[in-house]
Amino acid sequence: MTRYVFITGGVVSSLGKGLASAALAALLQARGYRVRLRKLDPYLNVDPGTMSPTQHGEVFVTDDGAETDLDLGHYERFTGLPASRADNVTTGRIYLDIITKERRGDYLGATIQVIPHVTNAIKAFVLDGNDDYDFVLVEIGGTVGDIEGLPFFEAIRQIGQERPRGSVCYLHLTLLPYIPSAGELKTKPTQHSVKELRSIGIQPDILLCRCDRPIPVDERRKLGLFCNVRESAVIEARDVDTIYAVPLSYREAGLDREILAHFQMKPEGEPKLERWQNILERVRNPEGEVTIAIVGKYTGLKDAYKSLTEALTHGGIANNVRVNLEWIEAEVFEREDPAPFLEGLHGILVPGGFGQRGAEGKIRAARYARERNIPYFGICFGMQMAVIEAARSLAGITDANSTEFGETREPVVGLLTEWMRGNELERRAAESDLGGTMRLGAYKATLAEGTKIAQMYGDTEISERHRHRYEVNMAYRECLEAKGLRFSGTSPDGLLPETVEHEGHPWFIGVQFHPELKSRPFEPHPLFKGFIAAAIEQSRLV
């Protein structure tokens, strides 16, 4: 029988429901159970693909091309299980599907209502395709009391009524704030949050309490009494120094044991957490450190680069060093000399992005790395800016630019719906070979033998995830390669450039895809492993 755990949040947002869900899944995996993770997002957007990264954080892209919430990245990194479009749904997607069916006449003239039509659609999503799993963990985005979340809470309430007794658990993540003047943790916000949850028909079975210090026995007893849960079900979720300590912290607090007790399942031995202990040891006790500059466009919200920062951490784990990050807004380099900001650093990473803002700053960062022989890693937009820099500085194409920024005489970078014949832009229809305007999901690529990137992968055939509208123009390949910028990887048909590298440079690589989306703490991505290794070599020179 499949068992369902619904993870809700209260008191404040951004408590870490995604990490809590991922950590619980890791603990259940460590006990040998088959686990699936799913996310319900109450916002009205169909998906986060068009949402501002400075508001919502990064868009996590799955192998099958879904643009999803960043929490799915946590799910993949902690469990090693690939997510798909079937693991994330929004209010916008639910309503779009229902309205499409209504316009088609599928409801045979019925009045379409939130109950039962919207709630039934949510239930169908949650319950679909779970027969092969022991546990399905479902995170509900937002906070209890949000108006847009009500249909989702009603749907999971109904699931609890309709499923066999003992097959559903409601876990509520909440906050116990410490008030210095009173010298104590306050339970009242949690009591009110649970009261709100109970008012819509859901009695939490387990309270997972975020706090920065131990919960006194009296406070734990009070929470159990007034929130109507067992005292043993009040679980301490203490703040930790790294997210990779969370599974072990939850294990110590007894979360996995309480979950099994709720389902009346007898634990068989102890969870196998050796690999988590090894990772934590490497994170907390590195043998050295390097400093990497991230020259980005959305540095005001670090969640905009969540997978990227974690992938850099994984690269550090692989090389047993701590990776320190220097966040630099790309626009700064359009006004100021990059040298004072970048001198003494051990690597420069220019990540993806959209739009003209900060583009020239990223180009200047690429030039600085090339001229000073500093390791450079350009991802998506970062690769495109590196190619434009090479075209201008090495090939003498002074007007080289991207059509993303307007008309240009030298379209070194163009839309996927455009193709170049010489310097002429040929418009491509959406149904032509190059597809639509956004290249999403996993695509295969072929790497040239003997290149630095092929050596790092240990293979010439790879598959990586993409999210971009623009591509480097292959018409410029010959003149750029003559100046030392090698097109080291292409699509299998040879039409689209996937990777470039500067020959003669210690480590200068650009990739059109997003390798950070496939990096795991237990399987660091080879490019991040190689980039940090190059940064270590650079640290010995400065």
From Swiss-Prot:
Disulfide bonds: none
Catalysis performed (reactions): UTP + L-glutamine + ATP + H2O = CTP + L-glutamate + ADP + phosphate + 2 H(+); L-glutamine + H2O = L-glutamate + NH4(+); UTP + NH4(+) + ATP = CTP + ADP + phosphate + 2 H(+)
Database matches in SUPFAM superfamilies: Class I glutamine amidotransferase-like (SSF52317), P-loop containing nucleoside triphosphate hydrolases (SSF52540)
Notes on how activity is controlled: Allosterically activated by GTP, when glutamine is the substrate; GTP has no effect on the reaction when ammonia is the substrate. The allosteric effector GTP functions by stabilizing the protein conformation that binds the tetrahedral intermediate(s) formed during glutamine hydrolysis. Inhibited by the product CTP, via allosteric rather than competitive inhibition.
Binding-site list for CTP: S13, D146, I147, E148, K186, T187, K188, P189, T190, Q191, K222
One BP term from GO: pyrimidine nucleobase biosynthetic process
Chain positions recorded as L-glutamine binding sites: G353, F381, G382, M383, Q384, E404, R469
Positions of the catalytic residues: C380 (nucleophile), H514, E516
Sites where the protein binds ATP: S14, L15, G16, K17, G18, L19, D71, R238, D239, V240
Pathway: Pyrimidine metabolism; CTP biosynthesis via de novo pathway; CTP from UDP: step 2/2
List of residues binding Mg(2+): D71, E139
Top EC class for this record: ligase
Domain called Glutamine amidotransferase type-1: residue spans: 291-541
Family annotation (InterPro entries): Class_I_gatase-like, CTP_synthase, CTP_synthase_N, GATASE, GATase1_CTP_Synthase, P-loop_NTPase
GO cellular component: cytosol
Similarity comment: Belongs to the CTP synthase family.
Protein purpose: Catalyzes the ATP-dependent amination of UTP to CTP with either L-glutamine or ammonia as the source of nitrogen. Regulates intracellular CTP levels through interactions with the four ribonucleotide triphosphates.
Further remark: CTPSs have evolved a hybrid strategy for distinguishing between UTP and CTP. The overlapping regions of the product feedback inhibitory and substrate sites recognize a common feature in both compounds, the triphosphate moiety. To differentiate isosteric substrate and product pyrimidine rings, an additional pocket far from the expected kinase/ligase catalytic site, specifically recognizes the cytosine and ribose portions of the product inhibitor.
Protein's recorded name: CTP synthase
Biological classification of the source: Bacteria, Pseudomonadati, Pseudomonadota, Alphaproteobacteria, Hyphomicrobiales
